[in-house]
């Protein structure tokens, strides 16, 4: 009988392979707008067992992001996310949380979004590297947008140390976003965006690491021609800097 780790590795590999047929390639673009941006992220995951042994399966997620557009010169978005998780095993956990996003458009008032999210998080250490799969469902309450938008996000991450027991590692990940319903004024059911990242990670210790690299963000921004199914697209070239804490 195959070992449990081998089975988990196969499941995660199949999950990742399913992203190869990305939805973005199936959508013809009418126009493409590009920008260089800077995203900063701090994410902390705390295990509550250190406070009370009876809470050893419970987790807390705290995250803060700052995003800057126009070559990184102007604030674009601020995001705060918090959640509570429960460990089903050493490699699987389920989560429920809330996020608030403030968007700062040019020549317009700040737009606010309140978001409820649920996710399943899977991790595995394979012989060829570390794998992470995150499936997240969101209910987005966006100012001046109706009805509530439902969105599915699938994230797959791979990392591998540059040499045995090295603190420095190669990090690759991809995340696909799909709208599960249509909303007004212009968001339609289907592909929303894709984010792909390539960079380096450095582990200061088992509890802290930083990841720096290039993220490509492809966004289907609005409908141009419903008859021809054409859309405006935006491509953002992003310098991504993230700090992760395991407490």
Regions found by a protein language model. Give the residues of each.
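Solvent-exposed loop/turn segments connecting transmembrane beta-strands
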Residues: 31-39, 68-77, 107-111, 142-148, ...
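Outer-membrane beta-barrel transmembrane domain signature
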Residues: 130, 134-225, 245-247
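Outer-membrane beta-barrel "beta-signal"
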Residues: 120, 233-247
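Repeated loop/turn-to-beta-strand initiation elements of outer-membrane beta-barrel proteins
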Residues: 51-60, 91-96, 127-131, 165-169, ...
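Short glycine/proline- and aromatic-enriched beta-strand/turn motifs that initiate or cap beta-hairpins
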Residues: 29-74, 244
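N-terminal signal peptide c-region/cleavage motif recognized by signal peptidases
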Residues: 24-28
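Membrane-embedded beta-strand positions in outer-membrane beta-barrel channels/transporters
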Residues: 41-43, 81, 117-119, 155-157, ...
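Residue-level signature of outer-membrane beta-barrel architecture
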Residues: 46-48, 86, 122-124, 160-162, ...
